[in-house]
A protein has these predicted regions:
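Acyl/amide activation-and-transfer machinery of modular secondary-metabolite enzymes
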Residues: 36-54, 95-123
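Flexible, Gly/Pro-enriched loop and linker segments at secondary-structure and domain junctions
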Residues: 15-44, 64, 154-180
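Aromatic (phenylalanine/tyrosine) cluster motif
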Residues: 7-8, 13
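Hydrophobic "lid/gating" helix adjacent to the active-site nucleophile
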Residues: 61-99
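Helical lid/core segments from catalytic subdomains that handle acyl or acyl-like groups
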Residues: 105-167
Length: 180
């Protein structure tokens, strides 16, 4: 997408663009799937991470952060993975999506952290490392999720990584009216 493209209007925040559904080439797909209880999709695949894991070890860095970066970078390189529906029910296109991941906290279960995407790996790594090593003891484990729900812009990719656990597919809960 580029400025002036005929099927979106720019939001004042310049991070998301409101799609004109009537002029959108995916209008029919959207109309078909929009009423599904779970219209989300997830991709589960096996990836050989041997070289990436070795590179992280050699650099004395977190393989987990290498992995998060690879996932969020890939999502940002594919336009179709940056479309969302906002709290007003409008389809929006985000210039950038961040990543949310649960981080294990000693003595507790986990803490959900939103890590901003930066194309520059070093900047991403430094900020992500600072965020996951400075989780407040008395913080809300679902704070990042609650902020997303309040703002109504789901400009993120959700990723849970469980080290050394083999599985071929997983889905997660999705809060919706009536199940609460």
């Amino acid at each position: 997408l580029v400025k002036g493209h005929p099927f979106f209007t720019e939001s004042p925040f310049c991070m998301k663009h409101i799609i004109d559904i009537d002029a959108w080439e995916r209008r029919d797909n959207y109309g078909f799937f929009r009423s599904f209880v779970n219209s989300w999709y997830s991709v589960t695949t096996e990836i050989d991470c041997t070289e990436a894991s070795a590179a992280a070890r050699a650099a004395k860095r977190s393989f987990f952060l290498y992995y998060l970066y690879a996932v969020v970078r890939s999502a940002n390189e594919v336009d179709e993975l940056r479309y969302r529906t906002d709290k007003e029910g409008r389809v929006v296109f985000h210039d950038r999506v961040d990543i949310i991941s649960p981080i294990a906290v000693p003595g507790k279960t986990f803490y959900t952290v939103r890590i901003p995407y930066h194309e520059d790996f070093e900047r991403f790594y430094a900020e992500a490392h600072a965020l996951i090593t400075d989780i407040p003891e008395d913080g809300d484990p679902y704070g990042a999720e609650k902020i997303l729900a309040e703002q109504g812009d789901y400009d993120v990719v959700h990723l849970s990584a469980v080290p050394k656990m083999y599985f071929t597919s997983i889905t997660y809960t999705l809060a919706e009216a009536g199940n609460g």
